[in-house]
Amino acid sequence: MKDKLITLEEIKEAYKKLKTHVYNDSFNLRLRTKLADFEYDKDIELLFEGLLYDINNDNIDKYLSKISTYILPKKVPSKKLGNTNIVRNDVCGFFDDIDLTEEDYNFYIDAPIEIYLIDVLWMMKEGFLLIDSQIKNDCYGNSLVFETNGDSYGIKHGHYLFERYFDKYQKWRDNGIKIAREQTQHKNDVLLVCLDIQRFYPTSLIDFSKIQETLQSRNSDLFLTGILERIYVSYQNVLDEVNRRKSKFPQLPIGLLSAGIIANWYLSDFDKEIKERFNPIYYGRYVDDIFMVLGNVKPNKNEDWFDEKFLYEEGSPLIPEKVIDNNNEENKRYKLRSHSNLYINSQKLKLFYFAPNHSLAILDNFQKRLDENSSAFWFLPEDDANETLNSIGFDIIYDDTINKFREISGIKNSKYGVSVFLTKQIKKEIICRDNANTSLKEDLFKYFTGNRLIDMYSLWEKVFTYFVVTNDTDAIRKFENSICKQIDLIKIKDCNTNTQLIRNSLQKHCTYCKNMAMALNYDMIDDIELMDLPCKLRSTYLIRQHYTPFPVIIYTDSKINNIISSDIYNELLTSDNINLTIIQVAPYINPRKIHAHEICLINLFNYIKNFSDTHSSFDSGKLIDELITYDLCSDINLSQCKGVKLENNDKQEVDIPKTTCKSDEFGNAKQQIKVALSNIKISNNDLISAIKGAPILNSAKRERHFHLINLSTEEKVDCLLLPEVSLPKELLVTYAEHSRRKQQLIIAGIEHIVSYNKCFNFSVVFLPYIHKGNKEVFILPRLKNHYSPDETREILKYRKQVPTLSPSIYHLINWQGVQFTVFNCYELADVLHRSLFKSKIDIMFAIEYNKDTCYYSNIVEATCRDLHCYFIQANTSDYGDSRLSMPKRSVEMTPVKIKGGDNDTIITFTVDIKSLRDFQRQSTLFQNKEDFKNTPPGFDHDFVSQRDSR
């Protein structure tokens, strides 16, 4: 027996990377389903040990024999109705058949999970060495995540194999545009060149002897490379049998992750030739798409100018050829000199010339469109009467001006637009279902019809999901039947075998799509025999977790059929059958990182369910320890210590724990913070309903909060402040995700939460930070110390109880160097409690639902000067007095103050932390009263420096 070449830990690492990739992939549902079946209810360690033995003993024939293939459409070609000048909206359903040629579909590898694991192991152990510095610089697609620390070179340990697709694609495109702009600003001519290799994967020829040669030159083992070659050859034999031909070399298998790495290496010599011949100021390749920028190049009027200048000389990397197409017309294509099997269609060669003294309108409008598309994912979905499926789902093609109807020459489908639109509708319906869009169902069936239904097969899952979310079983059946009917119309020219194969493949894909949707709500499954696959997908954590209102619930033992119900929060807090303990899942089983805010919320709900007046404090110190265990923070990020503990005249204890929150690479403290002060109206009816234990979350309230979040994103604020009892508990995850992604501090009051007859009023602070390159947010809730008399009467009126804290608790928080505390409305009336923060804070935030603005205005002004800090408070807009106040003379004290209005909005301002601290560091005698009021007697100047936590 050979020495052990692969270890069990390496197989676990490979499985973790494979599962994470599959989880984040929105396309390959067949592999996702295979993975769920492979793992579900199995002793997975035993499976790994079996694979370990087979690999190390070169016993993989049993896996190779199970390799097969399936076919999915690449595109559905549009048909024309002869020589007609009629523009029709029913062309997609006008023809009886859907005819496909070789250009219109792709073969995909279908193999046992063990094959995919060997594939990833090869990348981890040997394949990564194919990627040199040139490939790293030139290639933006399939970019491996390399270890950046220390002297080791290899793929980084953790969940991810590749860098995020969206980020790399954006860089590939934006870097070229940026350089082109810079050249025009320097008065240089610029030529943008876009190339696309025709059918790259299917026409590639991979010679593994050259791969071995490259790896040997870099001191790599070749054991796994030999196994990988057998996988590629076995798959090629399957393709050759299907297509009745014999290949000398295997092609790149679509569906194997290693193909992306080998593809980048395979074309690296072509990259080098192109750069040497064209000398571009920017060159980038995304798989088979090439984008380069040439400087100081000015085309002439000759149609063949580009070929004459760059391609007719000896040694050109592209060789022009004349070809006759299917319509017996002569066309041009370009053969790659380094790979004579690869071609670039002349129609895919695009040149864009920009003279520095002329308009850059094309570049500007293209960039604007890109920005609009990318920003679609920055904002939460708001209702827009003008945004319908019909307006989003089509792009109108004009011959001339858009103002004349006769200039319309046609329409084309917008797959991207429909995808974004459906995602928005799904999210809105999950959060609130008070008025499902009945017209959308009709529009969906009108849109997904005819050959367009097949062309949009990648969106089937989203349509099924929408119908599951809206509990529409009839629509699910109807949509499935429509798909089946259209699949039966597909024909592949001159190949009955492939016709049957693509039909079977699409039928399976339809089943996978439906089951992915059903896994979100078992109540939609009316046949127990159909529970198998949805149950496997959910149990292995491979569902679309981002759709669920409380994603971490699937990591508990809770048995909840419908995990996309917005009512899930009420169940969490009132049901004894729901266990809110996170199951310890092996890292290689969990396809995603559980975030800090999810653990925080689990702890909050457990605190509420298990609340005891005799032992009532929320143990955030224990929570921080738990986060450290999950590697979601370190003592660099979050720390807690007892700040103050004293007794007032009534012998009541007051406890002030201090929480420090900052990012790993925290530099200087924030000198200023930009604050968004909300101006929203809190409905008294909503308040009373929440106290009764029947909170209202309708579309209007959802829209209000989405709008506020989007405004804060648009304004790029550091902090968002909302009033008391303004935040529905159902939106806690939404706000936490926003705070995490945008690294935005959020302070708000949660609507009253009733659990076991106790009525809780919480303030909550979302504290974002970065840990090991990952964005996280720590949620710090605090139960109100002093319920107001009016509030207490309402609670007792409806036979609920007021929970009491002993001792009273306030938080002293240092976030990124800014030190503050939060008071919840009636707490401000306690002068002793306010005084505890003298010298200790830069800002006092106050959240209120308060009619008595005159009284509280006096408190604000007194507190602002007595504590010598900024005072920022948010109240419901109908009572007003939301404001920023500063310890300055009266005419300058309150530069921001808002009240009233019908629309919900925010007002932003910048709070200068540095200037206040610089002033407070000075001895009172030397302070300039033009800047701020003098610090009050007893102010501890030494405390100022302690606020800057570094």
List the predicted regions and their residue ranges.
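Active-site catalytic loop in hydrolytic enzyme cores
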Residues: 629, 633, 637-668, 758-839, ...
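N-terminal, active-site-proximal structural segment of metallo-dependent hydrolase catalytic domains
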Residues: 26-44, 618, 625, 632-719, ...
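CN hydrolase (nitrilase-like) catalytic-core segments centered on the catalytic cysteine
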Residues: 537, 541-556, 721, 726-752, ...
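Conserved polymerase palm-domain catalytic core
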Residues: 177-287, 291-305, 343, 351, ...
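Active-site-proximal beta-strand elements of phosphoester/diester hydrolases
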Residues: 672-694, 781-783, 818-827, 845-848
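C-terminal beta-strand edge segments of enzyme domains
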Residues: 550-660, 862-863, 875-950
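Conserved two-metal-ion catalytic palm core of "right-hand" nucleic acid polymerases
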Residues: 1-223, 448-450, 491-498
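C-terminal polymerase-core module
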Residues: 297-446
